[in-house]
């Protein structure tokens, strides 16, 4: 019998030691996100979390998301620090529009070859996003899968669970004619429309690292992390009777605002109430993108739209601006049986 080489998992492309080194690197930042309801620490087969005692009839709200092809841009530019914030933002912002307080977050990080520095940078960003939104990072999965991803390319997904009092769920059912719509300003394209962004960069031939826009590289505008609205919106809900909140993600104005409108209502958006941030003007010009397509693909400077009764509008604006948001009246709700649920004029 001939001697055979003894193979290991590492020979197959999976470095368990690198995975353990990553866990050691992130323990500290993960611990900072801990909430009092969390039971146990990292390393268990599952994460345990009790419900906060203040809820009388708690309803759990869950969500999952990724960051789309913004990830490709981040990998190409070797800038991974904000992607984790994006990941958390896309999940927790979807929860808070229903009135839910985010409780805990889990992440999935998959790669062809684990680079500990890159992965730690991403997870540090996830922890920062959890701190910004007040939820605990209770666990995750790091999968090194040679042959599934090219080189050190990676993908991330996030999962979040929150809680809301049953009687305080925000579902849009109370939106009515005469309601005022308030906008919350975005930090940029957030995490949507990046396949079109990358196509525009390709067609225009620009270098995002050397092309300047308002005095800073285009890359800085494009990789600005998604704004997390959780704490501001929860404060608003505590003090104002909010009828609906729309998170402007994929589908932009045309598809997201109708998701919270009852039948026979229409959102009328006043386009003159705000000026697009420079990055959106650049994208439209460089890509010769139509106005309709811009509002369908991008948030165009508006991260959320909130519906509430007209007498509450000024108080809501004062509260939101005091919390550091850029908030303004962007439109109204009208009665309409038109199939066009959103009008921008």
UniProtKB/Swiss-Prot annotation:
GO terms for cellular component: cytosol. This is Phosphoribosylformylglycinamidine cyclo-ligase. PANTHER family: TRIFUNCTIONAL PURINE BIOSYNTHETIC PROTEIN ADENOSINE-3 (PTHR10520:SF12), TRIFUNCTIONAL PURINE BIOSYNTHETIC PROTEIN ADENOSINE-3-RELATED (PTHR10520). Gene3D superfamilies: PurM-like C-terminal domain (3.90.650.10), PurM-like, N-terminal domain (3.30.1330.10). It is an enzyme of class 6 (ligase). Its main location: cytoplasm. It catalyses: 2-formamido-N(1)-(5-O-phospho-beta-D-ribosyl)acetamidine + ATP = 5-amino-1-(5-phospho-beta-D-ribosyl)imidazole + ADP + phosphate + H(+). GO terms for molecular function: ATP binding; phosphoribosylamine-glycine ligase activity; phosphoribosylformylglycinamidine cyclo-ligase activity. Keywords: ATP-binding, Cytoplasm, Ligase, Nucleotide-binding, Purine biosynthesis. Its EC number is 6.3.3.1. Pathway: Purine metabolism; IMP biosynthesis via de novo pathway; 5-amino-1-(5-phospho-D-ribosyl)imidazole from N(2)-formyl-N(1)-(5-phospho-D-ribosyl)glycinamide: step 2/2. It is found in: Cytoplasm. It comes from the Bacteria. NCBIfam families: purM. Belongs to the AIR synthase family. The lineage of its organism: Bacteria, Pseudomonadati, Pseudomonadota, Gammaproteobacteria, Enterobacterales. One of its GO terms (biological process) is 'de novo' IMP biosynthetic process.
